[in-house]
Amino acid sequence: MTKITVFGMGSFGTALANVLAENGHDVLMWGKNQEAVDELNTCHTNKKYLKYAKLDVNIIATSDMTKAIQYADIYLMALPTKAMREVATQINDKLTSKKTFIHVAKGIENGTFKRVSEMIEDSISPEYNAGIGVLSGPSHAEEVVVKQPTTVAASSKDKNVSKLTQDLFMNDYLRVYTNDDLVGVELGGALKNIIAVASGIVAGIGYGDNAKAALMTRGLAEISRLGEKLGADPMTFLGLGGIGDLIVTCTSTHSRNFTLGYKLGQGESMDQALSEMNMVVEGIYTTKSVYHLAKEKNVDMPITNALYRVLFENISVKECVKDLMERDKKSE
Protein backbone atom coordinates (compact mmCIF):
# COMPACT_ATOMS: atom_id res chain seq x y z
CA MET A 1 0.00 0.00 0.00
CA THR A 2 0.98 3.64 -0.49
CA LYS A 3 2.52 5.83 2.21
CA ILE A 4 1.04 9.33 2.52
CA THR A 5 1.92 12.24 4.80
CA VAL A 6 -0.93 14.59 5.69
CA PHE A 7 0.29 18.08 6.58
CA GLY A 8 -2.31 19.68 8.84
CA MET A 9 -4.55 18.25 11.54
CA GLY A 10 -7.73 20.25 10.98
CA SER A 11 -11.15 18.76 10.32
CA PHE A 12 -10.83 18.02 6.60
CA GLY A 13 -7.26 16.78 6.77
CA THR A 14 -8.28 14.43 9.57
CA ALA A 15 -11.34 13.17 7.72
CA LEU A 16 -9.30 12.50 4.57
CA ALA A 17 -6.54 10.83 6.56
CA ASN A 18 -9.22 8.49 7.84
CA VAL A 19 -10.40 7.78 4.28
CA LEU A 20 -6.85 6.98 3.18
CA ALA A 21 -6.25 4.68 6.15
CA GLU A 22 -9.53 2.87 5.59
CA ASN A 23 -8.51 2.43 1.95
CA GLY A 24 -5.50 0.51 3.21
CA HIS A 25 -2.82 3.19 2.91
CA ASP A 26 -0.19 4.02 5.54
CA VAL A 27 -0.90 7.51 6.86
CA LEU A 28 1.22 9.86 8.96
CA MET A 29 -0.27 13.19 10.02
CA TRP A 30 1.88 16.20 10.84
CA GLY A 31 0.80 19.05 13.11
CA LYS A 32 2.38 21.68 15.35
CA ASN A 33 0.15 21.04 18.35
CA GLN A 34 1.79 18.31 20.44
CA GLU A 35 -1.38 17.77 22.49
CA ALA A 36 -3.34 17.01 19.32
CA VAL A 37 -0.57 14.69 18.12
CA ASP A 38 -0.58 12.82 21.44
CA GLU A 39 -4.38 12.59 21.47
CA LEU A 40 -4.47 11.07 18.00
CA ASN A 41 -1.72 8.56 18.77
CA THR A 42 -3.21 7.55 22.13
CA CYS A 43 -6.98 7.90 21.75
CA HIS A 44 -7.38 7.88 17.94
CA THR A 45 -9.48 11.04 18.11
CA ASN A 46 -9.21 14.71 17.16
CA LYS A 47 -11.93 16.16 19.36
CA LYS A 48 -11.18 19.82 18.69
CA TYR A 49 -12.27 19.44 15.07
CA LEU A 50 -14.25 16.18 14.86
CA LYS A 51 -15.70 15.85 18.33
CA TYR A 52 -17.38 12.45 18.15
CA ALA A 53 -15.33 10.67 15.48
CA LYS A 54 -13.26 7.59 16.24
CA LEU A 55 -10.41 7.44 13.73
CA ASP A 56 -8.67 4.49 12.12
CA VAL A 57 -6.19 3.05 14.62
CA ASN A 58 -3.49 2.80 11.94
CA ILE A 59 -3.20 6.58 11.53
CA ILE A 60 -0.14 7.94 13.32
CA ALA A 61 0.82 11.55 14.02
CA THR A 62 3.98 13.55 14.62
CA SER A 63 5.11 17.12 15.22
CA ASP A 64 8.52 16.30 13.73
CA MET A 65 8.72 17.96 10.31
CA THR A 66 11.75 15.92 9.19
CA LYS A 67 10.02 12.65 10.05
CA ALA A 68 6.88 13.74 8.19
CA ILE A 69 8.87 14.67 5.08
CA GLN A 70 10.86 11.45 5.02
CA TYR A 71 7.84 9.21 5.60
CA ALA A 72 6.24 9.36 2.15
CA ASP A 73 6.50 10.46 -1.48
CA ILE A 74 2.91 11.74 -1.58
CA TYR A 75 1.84 14.71 0.53
CA LEU A 76 -1.73 15.76 1.30
CA MET A 77 -1.53 19.49 2.03
CA ALA A 78 -4.48 20.10 4.35
CA LEU A 79 -3.52 23.55 5.61
CA PRO A 80 -5.20 26.97 5.58
CA THR A 81 -4.30 29.05 2.53
CA LYS A 82 -2.47 31.63 4.64
CA ALA A 83 -0.17 28.91 6.06
CA MET A 84 0.45 27.04 2.81
CA ARG A 85 3.45 28.97 1.47
CA GLU A 86 5.29 28.96 4.80
CA VAL A 87 4.88 25.21 5.35
CA ALA A 88 5.64 24.34 1.71
CA THR A 89 8.86 26.36 1.97
CA GLN A 90 9.82 24.53 5.17
CA ILE A 91 9.18 21.22 3.39
CA ASN A 92 11.26 22.26 0.39
CA ASP A 93 14.24 23.09 2.59
CA LYS A 94 14.40 19.46 3.75
CA LEU A 95 13.56 17.60 0.52
CA THR A 96 16.02 15.22 -1.13
CA SER A 97 13.71 13.57 -3.68
CA LYS A 98 10.61 14.23 -5.79
CA LYS A 99 7.23 14.41 -4.08
CA THR A 100 3.63 14.66 -5.29
CA PHE A 101 1.49 17.35 -3.64
CA ILE A 102 -2.30 17.11 -3.36
CA HIS A 103 -3.94 20.05 -1.61
CA VAL A 104 -7.43 20.63 -0.25
CA ALA A 105 -7.18 24.35 0.60
CA LYS A 106 -9.83 26.73 -0.72
CA GLY A 107 -8.48 30.24 -0.92
CA ILE A 108 -6.60 32.92 -2.85
CA GLU A 109 -3.37 34.35 -1.45
CA ASN A 110 -3.51 37.94 -0.24
CA GLY A 111 -1.24 40.28 -2.20
CA THR A 112 -0.17 37.87 -4.94
CA PHE A 113 -3.72 36.71 -5.85
CA LYS A 114 -2.28 33.25 -6.51
CA ARG A 115 -4.19 29.99 -6.35
CA VAL A 116 -2.95 27.39 -3.87
CA SER A 117 -1.33 25.15 -6.50
CA GLU A 118 0.63 28.19 -7.69
CA MET A 119 1.75 28.90 -4.12
CA ILE A 120 3.03 25.34 -3.77
CA GLU A 121 4.71 25.49 -7.18
CA ASP A 122 6.47 28.71 -6.16
CA SER A 123 7.71 27.11 -2.95
CA ILE A 124 8.94 23.71 -4.19
CA SER A 125 12.09 23.48 -6.31
CA PRO A 126 11.37 21.93 -9.74
CA GLU A 127 13.75 19.03 -9.07
CA TYR A 128 11.57 17.98 -6.11
CA ASN A 129 8.15 18.58 -7.70
CA ALA A 130 6.56 15.42 -9.12
CA GLY A 131 3.21 17.15 -9.64
CA ILE A 132 0.57 19.23 -7.87
CA GLY A 133 -3.17 18.59 -7.70
CA VAL A 134 -6.31 19.54 -5.81
CA LEU A 135 -9.20 17.59 -4.31
CA SER A 136 -12.29 19.77 -4.04
CA GLY A 137 -16.06 19.71 -4.01
CA PRO A 138 -19.07 19.54 -1.68
CA SER A 139 -17.53 17.66 1.23
CA HIS A 140 -18.13 18.51 4.88
CA ALA A 141 -15.53 16.74 7.00
CA GLU A 142 -18.20 15.90 9.56
CA GLU A 143 -20.04 13.83 6.94
CA VAL A 144 -16.99 12.27 5.28
CA VAL A 145 -15.65 10.93 8.58
CA VAL A 146 -18.92 9.07 9.28
CA LYS A 147 -19.04 7.68 5.73
CA GLN A 148 -21.93 9.73 4.40
CA PRO A 149 -22.00 9.51 0.56
CA THR A 150 -19.82 12.30 -0.82
CA THR A 151 -18.64 13.20 -4.32
CA VAL A 152 -15.65 15.40 -5.18
CA ALA A 153 -13.37 16.34 -8.07
CA ALA A 154 -9.62 15.78 -8.48
CA SER A 155 -7.74 18.11 -10.80
CA SER A 156 -4.17 18.83 -11.89
CA LYS A 157 -2.23 20.09 -14.89
CA ASP A 158 -0.87 16.53 -14.97
CA LYS A 159 -3.56 13.93 -15.71
CA ASN A 160 -1.47 11.30 -13.93
CA VAL A 161 -1.77 13.27 -10.69
CA SER A 162 -5.54 13.56 -11.11
CA LYS A 163 -5.80 9.81 -11.68
CA LEU A 164 -3.51 9.09 -8.71
CA THR A 165 -5.71 11.25 -6.48
CA GLN A 166 -8.81 9.45 -7.71
CA ASP A 167 -7.23 6.05 -7.05
CA LEU A 168 -6.03 6.98 -3.55
CA PHE A 169 -9.27 8.40 -2.21
CA MET A 170 -12.15 6.71 -4.01
CA ASN A 171 -14.20 4.09 -2.15
CA ASP A 172 -17.82 3.12 -1.58
CA TYR A 173 -18.72 6.37 0.21
CA LEU A 174 -16.31 8.86 -1.42
CA ARG A 175 -16.68 9.10 -5.19
CA VAL A 176 -13.94 11.02 -7.01
CA TYR A 177 -14.23 12.38 -10.55
CA THR A 178 -11.24 13.72 -12.45
CA ASN A 179 -11.41 17.19 -14.01
CA ASP A 180 -8.85 18.74 -16.36
CA ASP A 181 -9.63 22.36 -15.38
CA LEU A 182 -7.31 23.03 -12.44
CA VAL A 183 -7.92 26.78 -12.58
CA GLY A 184 -11.69 26.35 -12.46
CA VAL A 185 -11.74 23.75 -9.70
CA GLU A 186 -9.45 25.82 -7.46
CA LEU A 187 -11.33 29.05 -8.11
CA GLY A 188 -14.71 27.41 -7.55
CA GLY A 189 -13.59 26.12 -4.16
CA ALA A 190 -12.13 29.46 -3.11
CA LEU A 191 -14.72 31.90 -4.43
CA LYS A 192 -17.75 30.07 -3.06
CA ASN A 193 -16.51 30.87 0.46
CA ILE A 194 -17.25 34.54 -0.20
CA ILE A 195 -20.81 33.74 -1.20
CA ALA A 196 -21.14 31.39 1.79
CA VAL A 197 -20.33 34.17 4.25
CA ALA A 198 -22.86 36.39 2.49
CA SER A 199 -25.42 33.57 2.55
CA GLY A 200 -24.93 33.19 6.29
CA ILE A 201 -25.53 36.92 6.72
CA VAL A 202 -28.80 36.66 4.80
CA ALA A 203 -29.92 33.76 7.00
CA GLY A 204 -28.81 35.53 10.17
CA ILE A 205 -30.80 38.64 9.31
CA GLY A 206 -33.84 36.42 8.83
CA TYR A 207 -34.45 36.88 5.12
CA GLY A 208 -36.36 34.11 3.34
CA ASP A 209 -35.74 31.54 0.65
CA ASN A 210 -36.13 34.06 -2.17
CA ALA A 211 -33.18 36.09 -0.95
CA LYS A 212 -31.06 32.99 -0.33
CA ALA A 213 -31.72 31.64 -3.83
CA ALA A 214 -31.00 35.01 -5.43
CA LEU A 215 -27.73 35.33 -3.54
CA MET A 216 -26.45 31.91 -4.60
CA THR A 217 -27.53 32.42 -8.22
CA ARG A 218 -26.02 35.87 -8.59
CA GLY A 219 -23.01 34.69 -6.60
CA LEU A 220 -22.42 31.92 -9.11
CA ALA A 221 -22.67 34.51 -11.89
CA GLU A 222 -19.85 36.62 -10.47
CA ILE A 223 -17.74 33.54 -9.69
CA SER A 224 -18.10 32.53 -13.34
CA ARG A 225 -17.23 36.02 -14.60
CA LEU A 226 -13.97 36.16 -12.68
CA GLY A 227 -13.17 32.52 -13.40
CA GLU A 228 -13.53 32.97 -17.14
CA LYS A 229 -11.34 36.09 -17.00
CA LEU A 230 -8.63 34.04 -15.26
CA GLY A 231 -8.74 31.22 -17.80
CA ALA A 232 -11.21 28.76 -16.27
CA ASP A 233 -13.76 26.79 -18.27
CA PRO A 234 -17.18 28.29 -17.36
CA MET A 235 -18.69 24.79 -17.42
CA THR A 236 -16.54 23.84 -14.42
CA PHE A 237 -18.66 26.12 -12.26
CA LEU A 238 -21.71 23.98 -13.07
CA GLY A 239 -19.94 20.92 -11.64
CA LEU A 240 -18.90 19.60 -8.24
CA GLY A 241 -16.11 22.16 -7.80
CA GLY A 242 -18.50 25.00 -8.60
CA ILE A 243 -22.23 24.89 -7.89
CA GLY A 244 -21.88 21.66 -5.91
CA ASP A 245 -19.49 23.22 -3.43
CA LEU A 246 -21.48 26.47 -3.47
CA ILE A 247 -24.74 24.77 -2.47
CA VAL A 248 -23.29 22.74 0.38
CA THR A 249 -21.33 25.67 1.82
CA CYS A 250 -24.16 28.19 1.53
CA THR A 251 -26.81 26.05 3.21
CA SER A 252 -25.19 24.28 6.14
CA THR A 253 -24.14 25.10 9.68
CA HIS A 254 -21.24 22.66 9.15
CA SER A 255 -19.74 25.47 7.04
CA ARG A 256 -17.57 27.80 9.09
CA ASN A 257 -18.00 30.49 6.40
CA PHE A 258 -21.80 30.26 6.62
CA THR A 259 -21.59 30.23 10.42
CA LEU A 260 -19.47 33.38 10.51
CA GLY A 261 -21.94 35.12 8.21
CA TYR A 262 -24.88 33.98 10.31
CA LYS A 263 -23.32 35.46 13.43
CA LEU A 264 -22.67 38.74 11.61
CA GLY A 265 -26.28 38.77 10.41
CA GLN A 266 -27.38 38.29 14.02
CA GLY A 267 -25.52 41.45 14.96
CA GLU A 268 -22.24 40.10 16.32
CA SER A 269 -18.96 41.81 15.49
CA MET A 270 -16.41 39.89 13.42
CA ASP A 271 -14.01 39.70 16.37
CA GLN A 272 -16.74 38.33 18.62
CA ALA A 273 -17.86 35.76 16.04
CA LEU A 274 -14.32 34.55 15.33
CA SER A 275 -13.48 34.24 19.03
CA GLU A 276 -16.54 32.03 19.53
CA MET A 277 -15.69 29.84 16.54
CA ASN A 278 -11.93 29.49 17.20
CA MET A 279 -11.38 28.20 13.64
CA VAL A 280 -9.89 29.55 10.40
CA VAL A 281 -12.55 31.07 8.15
CA GLU A 282 -11.09 31.10 4.64
CA GLY A 283 -13.83 33.37 3.30
CA ILE A 284 -12.45 36.39 5.16
CA TYR A 285 -9.04 36.20 3.50
CA THR A 286 -10.51 35.23 0.14
CA THR A 287 -12.87 38.21 0.18
CA LYS A 288 -9.93 40.55 0.69
CA SER A 289 -7.92 38.95 -2.13
CA VAL A 290 -10.78 38.72 -4.61
CA TYR A 291 -12.03 42.25 -3.95
CA HIS A 292 -8.68 43.65 -5.10
CA LEU A 293 -8.19 41.03 -7.84
CA ALA A 294 -11.59 41.81 -9.38
CA LYS A 295 -10.76 45.51 -9.47
CA GLU A 296 -7.41 44.76 -11.09
CA LYS A 297 -9.10 42.58 -13.74
CA ASN A 298 -12.07 44.96 -14.12
CA VAL A 299 -14.63 42.25 -13.28
CA ASP A 300 -17.97 43.26 -11.76
CA MET A 301 -18.46 41.41 -8.44
CA PRO A 302 -21.12 43.31 -6.46
CA ILE A 303 -21.67 40.66 -3.76
CA THR A 304 -17.94 40.40 -3.12
CA ASN A 305 -17.70 44.20 -2.98
CA ALA A 306 -20.59 44.38 -0.50
CA LEU A 307 -19.10 41.70 1.74
CA TYR A 308 -15.72 43.44 1.68
CA ARG A 309 -17.41 46.59 3.00
CA VAL A 310 -19.03 44.61 5.82
CA LEU A 311 -15.84 42.77 6.82
CA PHE A 312 -13.26 45.52 6.38
CA GLU A 313 -15.07 48.88 6.34
CA ASN A 314 -17.63 48.37 9.13
CA ILE A 315 -20.63 48.99 6.89
CA SER A 316 -23.83 47.51 8.32
CA VAL A 317 -25.12 44.33 6.69
CA LYS A 318 -28.58 45.80 6.09
CA GLU A 319 -27.11 48.86 4.40
CA CYS A 320 -25.15 46.60 2.03
CA VAL A 321 -28.25 44.56 1.20
CA LYS A 322 -30.10 47.81 0.47
CA ASP A 323 -27.28 48.98 -1.81
CA LEU A 324 -27.30 45.66 -3.70
CA MET A 325 -31.06 45.80 -4.25
CA GLU A 326 -30.94 49.42 -5.43
CA ARG A 327 -28.17 49.00 -8.00
CA ASP A 328 -28.80 50.25 -11.53
CA LYS A 329 -31.20 48.23 -13.68
CA LYS A 330 -29.46 45.46 -15.62
CA SER A 331 -30.13 42.54 -17.92
CA GLU A 332 -29.41 39.11 -16.47
UniProtKB/Swiss-Prot annotation:
Reactions catalysed: sn-glycerol 3-phosphate + NAD(+) = dihydroxyacetone phosphate + NADH + H(+); sn-glycerol 3-phosphate + NADP(+) = dihydroxyacetone phosphate + NADPH + H(+)
Species of the source: Staphylococcus aureus (strain MRSA252)
Biological pathway: Membrane lipid metabolism; glycerophospholipid metabolism
Gene Ontology cellular component list: cytosol
InterPro entries xrefs: 6-PGluconate_DH-like_C_sf, 6PGD_dom2, G3P_DH_NAD-dep, G3P_DH_NAD-dep_C, G3P_DH_NAD-dep_N, NAD(P)-bd_dom_sf
Protein name, as recorded: Glycerol-3-phosphate dehydrogenase [NAD(P)+]
Biological process, per Gene Ontology: carbohydrate metabolic process; glycerol-3-phosphate biosynthetic process; glycerol-3-phosphate catabolic process; glycerophospholipid metabolic process; phospholipid biosynthetic process
Principal place of residence: cytoplasm
Catalytic activity, EC: 1.1.1.94
Residue sites binding sn-glycerol 3-phosphate per the record: K106, G137, S139, K192, D245, S255, R256, N257
Single GO term (MF): glycerol-3-phosphate dehydrogenase [NAD(P)+] activity
Family affiliation: Belongs to the NAD-dependent glycerol-3-phosphate dehydrogenase family.
Active-site annotation: K192
Record localization: Cytoplasm
NCBIfam families given in the database record: PRK00094.1-2, PRK00094.1-3, PRK00094.1-4
Protein purpose: Catalyzes the reduction of the glycolytic intermediate dihydroxyacetone phosphate (DHAP) to sn-glycerol 3-phosphate (G3P), the key precursor for phospholipid synthesis.
Gene3D superfamilies hit by this protein: N-(1-d-carboxylethyl)-l-norvaline Dehydrogenase, domain 2, NAD(P)-binding Rossmann-like Domain
Residues that bind NADPH: S11, F12, K32, K106, A141, R256, V280, E282
Keyword Protein biosynthesis belongs to the record: no
